[in-house]
From Swiss-Prot:
Belongs to the ATP-dependent AMP-binding enzyme family. This is Acetyl-coenzyme A synthetase. One of its GO terms (molecular function) is ATP binding. GO terms for cellular component: cytosol. It comes from Bartonella tribocorum (strain CIP 105476 / IBS 506).
Length: 647
């Protein structure tokens, strides 16, 4: 990792919201007196009834997290209504379609009307405060309308990434007991059609077998392609939306009422329903968006994330709209119709801030510089990265080639569970280092801890923990508070364990080194190894499977599968292809097996536990650091695995 320091640019210094001195002052205040700090910044949103209590949190037995607990507000009101008097005619949402010739611009006044109609349509179909609504949509404006409409009437949304399979959708429907689904006939991505309605139909059948019945499916028309239809259950959005009223009062919501459930991979294989509440989440999404992206009114802000991920929730929809920003939503991929698409969009819409994933950056870097050089990119002021640590080579390319040495790079570290940025540079306050997430955001107290639980001071490397709460923190895992405590607070008592490894350098900068648990970070998407292993062993040819990550030049981490076949089944290229297809069907298109190694046996301890540590080293080609293998029941298994490693 490089230690070269990139100073704060003079251009940014002239017009920044926060300089180095203010950052230090505010950070000290946020740690020494969090009540006062967050009381002040809690005013960044409008409250129907002001809060009198700020912070009521404990990471000890029982774990309880409450912020602004007696305040009453509404997320949709803050994202739309409060902007109407002063800038109702400003563009709220720019939509750029998969097809480069398709786009839309929606003002705040228009957004108000769309969301009110959508909210009334939900109400007309019996959806009420507290109901769970599943959203499985492509990146179209209606996806944002659906989220905001749920927030407006107090329904809890559960958005599912449109790349997930019917089985994955069903698991989420069953867990949150959702009886109402919003989907589209198809999605469009990279010029290809995705059968969303088909997936939903299959998911509903699977959920029904687990005694969860979906009563209504709202279908948004995207392609007009043929789909199956169930009369009495399915209804067309376009047929009913024009009859819905254009005014819908915003439901008064307690700050601690749930806003959404978002499922993320768990190390046990069953996805975890991360629950975020209303007041604290919105305050944190808004304040991080404002200061991390140094947001000034009138700027065009583009977060390339899908709404199916937390980044899409916090930094495509809720944070920017709460701040009255213009946010850009992109339906397509960075490489369609060619690898210059991102830069064309930047020029076309005069984008000032581009926030994207290292995976996309590495893929575009691999395409060479000519696509970038064919564009001007003069509107760009800031560049950001999210989803995984960015390697210094990709950082340097993004900075020099895309940003022409003048746009600070905001390498943000955070999680679905944190709701918003935790470690991040601030453009006017933080000198940069390529590959470092730099310093903690306000109110974030970090500790690096070794395997024995000792707190490490100064330069150190170990497990990253957070020792006190912040407003955007998840409140629980839906219907499973015990698992919430077990997952995040049992490893180090009284501390939130992130599951990430981290290094702190001599300047106090933090470098995220990757997951230390059984979660893979593939192209910025979290996949549980247990989830993939469970999918593999469902295949009739597979007796046993173990999955680990290995360094991948584009995706950050690749998926390496060690597979033991049933007695009498021979390995073949055909079977390999079938296993890849099978896992995609079970989990979704993001679960791609990069390497499959057929192994007659897996390395196990005498008690029968698979030694994944050894498999990880083999997958990484790191044969010299296998460590102690004397505890294995059959140590010779390791030699066979090394000899047959997939290059």
């Amino acid at each position: 990792m490089t230690e070269k320091i990139y100073p704060i640019s003079e251009e940014i210094k002239k017009n920044t919201l926060l300089d180095e001195e203010t950052y230090q002052k505010w950070y000290r205040e946020s740690i020494n007196d969090p009540e006062s700090f967050w009381a002040k910044h809690g005013q960044c949103i409008e409250w129907f009834k002001p809060f009198t209590k700020v912070k009521n949190t404990s990471f000890n037995d029982g774990v309880s997290i409450q912020w602004y607990e007696d305040g009453i507000t509404n997320v949709a009101y803050n994202c739309i209504d409060r902007h109407l008097k002063t800038h109702g005619d400003q563009i709220a949402l720019i939509w750029e379609g998969d097809n480069p010739y398709h786009d839309k611009k929606i003002t705040y006044n228009e957004l108000y009307e769309h969301v009110c109609r959508f909210a009334n349509l939900l109400k007309n179909h019996g959806v009420k405060k507290g109901d769970k609504v599943t959203i499985y949509l492509p990146m179209i404006p209606e996806a944002a309308y659906a989220m905001l409409a749920c927030a407006r009437i107090g329904a809890v949304h559960s958005v599912i990434f449109a790349g997930f399979s019917a089985e994955a959708i069903a698991g989420r429907i069953v867990d949150c007991e959702s009886t109402f689904i919003i989907t589209a006939d198809h999605g469009l991505r990279g010029g290809k059609r995705i059968n969303l309605k088909d997936n939903v139909d299959h998911a509903i059948e699977i959920a029904a077998r687990q005694n969860v019945r979906v009563d209504q499916v709202m279908v948004i028309r995207r392609t007009c392609g043929p789909i199956d239809w169930i009369e009495g259950r399915d209804f067309w959005y376009h047929e009913e939306i024009t009859h819905a009223k254009t005014n819908c009062p915003a439901e008064p919501m307690n700050a601690e009422d749930p806003l959404f459930i978002l499922y993320t991979s768990g190390s046990t294989g069953k996805p975890k329903g991360v629950l975020h509440s209303t007041g604290g989440y919105l305050v944190y999404a808004a304040i991080t968006h404002k200061y991390v992206f140094d947001y000034h009114p009138g700027e065009i802000y583009w977060c390339t994330a899908d709404i199916g991920w937390i980044t899409g929730h916090s930094y495509l929809v809720y944070g920017p709209l709460c701040n009255g920003a213009t946010t850009l939503m992109f339906e397509g991929t960075p490489t369609f119709p060619d690898k210059g698409r991102f830069w064309e969009i930047v020029d076309k819409h005069k984008v000032n801030t581009l926030y994207t994933a290292p995976t996309a950056i590495r893929a575009l870097m691999g395409a060479g510089n000519s696509f970038v050089e064919h564009s001007k990119r003069t509107s760009l002021r800031l560049l950001g990265t999210v989803g995984e640590p960015i390697n210094p080579e990709a950082w340097e390319w993004f900075y020099h080639t895309v940003g022409n040495d003048r746009c600070p790079i905001l390498d943000t570290w955070w999680q679905t569970e944190t709701g918003g940025h935790m470690i991040t540079p601030l453009p006017g306050a933080t000198p940069l280092k390529a590959g470092s997430a730099t310093r903690p955001f306000f109110g974030v107290q970090l500790q690096i801890i070794d395997e024995q639980g000792n707190i490490l001071e100064g330069e150190a490397e170990g497990n990253l923990c957070i020792i006190d709460s912040w407003p955007g923190q998840m409140r629980t895992l839906y219907k499973d508070h015990e698992r919430f405590i077990e997952t995040y607070f049992s490893t180090y008592k009284g501390k939130y364990f992130t599951g990430d490894g981290c290094r702190r350098d001599s300047d106090g900068y933090y470098w995220i080194t990757g997951r230390v648990d059984d979660i893979l970070n593939v192209s910025g998407h979290r996949l549980g190894t247990a989830e993939i292993e469970s999918a593999l062993v469902l295949h009739p040819a597979v007796s046993e499977a173990a999955v680990v990550g290995y360094p991948h030049p584009i995706k950050g981490q690749g998926v390496y599968s060690f597979v033991t076949l049933m007695e009498g089944t021979a390995p073949s290229e055909e079977l390999q292809k079938d296993l890849i297809k099978h896992v995609r069907k079970e989990i979704g298109s993001i679960a791609i097996l990069d390497k499959i190694q057929f192994a007659p046996q897996l390395p196990k301890t005498r008690s029968g536990k698979i030694m994944r540590r050894i498999l990880r080293k083999i997958a990484e080609n790191n044969f010299d650091n296998l460590g102690d293998i004397s505890t294995l029941a059959e140590p010779q298994v390791v030699e066979d695995l090394i000899a047959n490693r997939q290059n």
